[in-house]
Amino acid sequence: MADLKAHIAKVASGAALSFAEAREAFGIIMSGEATPSQIGGFLMALRVRGETVDEISGAVDTMRSKMLPVTAPAEAVDIVGTGGDASGTYNVSTCAAFIVAGCGVPVAKHGNRALSSKSGAADSLVALGVNIELGPDQIAACIAEAGVGFMFAPSHHAAMRHVGPTRVELGTRTIFNLLGPLSNPAGVKRQLVGVFSAQWVEPLAHVLRQLGTEKAWVVHGDGLDEMTTAGVTRVASLEYGEVRTFEITPEEVGLQRSAAAALKGGDGEYNGKALRRVLEGERNAYRDIAVLNAGGALIVAGKAETLKDAVALASESIESGRALAALEKLVEVSNRKP
């Protein structure tokens, strides 16, 4: 049986693991061959030294190899955040997913229940009447008919059960906070990924490049794991092997700057209602941040050349009723008897 001890010793010495070594180490962990103490020691050694692009890439490669896959169109996108930003915003990326679907771009949304906040994507979707306990064929049907399907992370990443208790006991962020958003079960090649800290914006774009992603924006918005209307958003854009970084303000795309407090959400019930009101056409700070993030995803999807044009497309998706129709269709299809 492979042993994690050699990898722990290497990381503890300050050295970095290669892609292959990281892949092996996480293979040991996700196969249940490491003890909780070994897993905890390994994760904290990585965290203290700082995870490298190769280590994250190797870990994601292992996670992808063990996941339950979903079939989605080649042009499908995901809009996902790492969580863990402690901001308590409403479910921006979930709202943006319906807006993007309303623009005719298939969305394969990967997410979970709340881990550190009051409400994760799954919590607000359940409050809206979406059935999240679906098999791969049912999710594929949701994407085909509603333009959006939701993949509930625990249903697709059973190997994570080996690390769950250790992560809870550690009570602090680890490399696993970065792996989930990069391990989409539909294997999407285009993503808008929000990260909890600006330090990860550029490295994660390089991880996605190493793993074969075609186009992605990795973003951090002034403390949020998404693009923000309350300040400046840092972006690392990956396009066919090239990574470049830049900053975005809401004003430059025609949106008003919001107070950070205006973006705060609540529990799943509250966030679900807030999301529906945005899709029904209510104009507020929730809408502005949703169309900004939808705009980023539409750029990644190749639907617009400029973010200003993409934001206009996103607004039109709401005003035409198509974004709300995508939500209502998802509720219908997800609850259909298989």
From Swiss-Prot:
Residues engaged in binding anthranilate 1: 81, 112
Enzymatic reactions: N-(5-phospho-beta-D-ribosyl)anthranilate + diphosphate = 5-phospho-alpha-D-ribose 1-diphosphate + anthranilate
Entry's EC annotation: 2.4.2.18
Name by which UniProt lists this protein: Anthranilate phosphoribosyltransferase
One CC-aspect GO term: cytosol
Keywords: Amino-acid biosynthesis, Aromatic amino acid biosynthesis, Glycosyltransferase, Magnesium, Metal-binding, Transferase, Tryptophan biosynthesis
Pfam families the UniProt entry points to: Glycos_trans_3N (PF02885), Glycos_transf_3 (PF00591)
Free-text remark on how the cofactor is bound: Binds 2 magnesium ions per monomer.
Binding site for anthranilate 2: 167
Residues annotated for 5-phospho-alpha-D-ribose 1-diphosphate binding in this entry: 81, 84-85, 89, 91-94, 109-117, 121
Cofactor(s) annotated in UniProt: Mg(2+)
Record lineage: Bacteria, Pseudomonadati, Pseudomonadota, Alphaproteobacteria, Hyphomicrobiales
Functional description taken from the UniProt entry: Catalyzes the transfer of the phosphoribosyl group of 5-phosphorylribose-1-pyrophosphate (PRPP) to anthranilate to yield N-(5'-phosphoribosyl)-anthranilate (PRA).
Group of enzyme by EC: transferase
UniProt binding sites for Mg(2+) 1: 93, 226
GO biological process terms, semicolon-separated: L-tryptophan biosynthetic process
InterPro entries membership: Anthranilate_Pribosyl_Tfrase, Glycosyl_Trfase_fam3, Glycosyl_Trfase_fam3_N_dom, Glycosyl_Trfase_fam3_N_dom_sf, Nuc_phospho_transferase
Domain of life: Bacteria
GO molecular function, one term: anthranilate phosphoribosyltransferase activity
Keyword hit for Metal-binding: yes
